[in-house]
From Swiss-Prot:
This is Arginine decarboxylase proenzyme. Its EC number is 4.1.1.19. Transmembrane segments: none annotated. The record marks 73-74 as: Cleavage (non-hydrolytic). GO terms for cellular component: cytosol. Its cofactor is pyruvate. Is synthesized initially as an inactive proenzyme. Formation of the active enzyme involves a self-maturation process in which the active site pyruvoyl group is generated from an internal serine residue via an autocatalytic post-translational modification. Two non-identical subunits are generated from the proenzyme in this reaction, and the pyruvate is formed at the N-terminus of the alpha chain, which is derived from the carboxyl end of the proenzyme. Belongs to the prokaryotic AdoMetDC family. Type 1 subfamily. It catalyses: L-arginine + H(+) = agmatine + CO2. Heterooctamer of four alpha and four beta chains arranged as a tetramer of alpha/beta heterodimers. The modification Pyruvic acid (Ser) is found at residue 74. Gene3D superfamilies: S-adenosylmethionine decarboxylase (3.60.90.10).
Length: 126
């Protein structure tokens, strides 16, 4: 009897996230537009959309919108604080053929911040 070697595929995890400053307040309140931006970002990044949920929060400095897309490869999230013209973006993928940086760049291009930060973390199993 011959033993067969099992080849394990490593977990490929890439996380791109950042903060966007100086974004137009009305855009940060527009739940439907933010949903469309996240959906298009998933397509651009070659991610497979499973579901998108969003919530609009009211109440002073806590007012804002959160959009979270569950993708087969992981998730995309935007959280906004319109009173501060501020948003955070989180794109995580464990898919070898998806491009989280492309999704992040698209979201930034659509939100058009005055400035932004971007961070990258390799979260792969090694």
């Amino acid at each position: 009897m011959q033993a067969t070697a099992q080849v394990q595929t490593p977990v490929v995890g890439r996380h791109v996230y950042g903060e966007l400053y100086g974004v137009d307040e009305s855009l940060l309140k527009d739940e439907e537009r933010l949903r469309r931006i996240v959906i298009e970002a998933a397509h651009i990044a070659n991610m497979h959309l499973v579901e998108v949920n969003s919530w609009k929060f009211k109440g002073g400095d806590k007012e804002g919108v959160s959009v979270i897309a569950l993708v087969l490869e992981s998730h995309i999230a935007i959280h906004t604080w319109p009173v501060y013209n501020f948003a955070t973006v989180d794109v995580y993928t464990c898919g070898e053929h998806s491009d989280p940086m492309a999704a992040f760049r698209y979201i930034v291009s659509q939100l058009n911040p005055k400035r932004f930060t971007v961070n990258y973390s390799d979260r792969s199993y090694k």
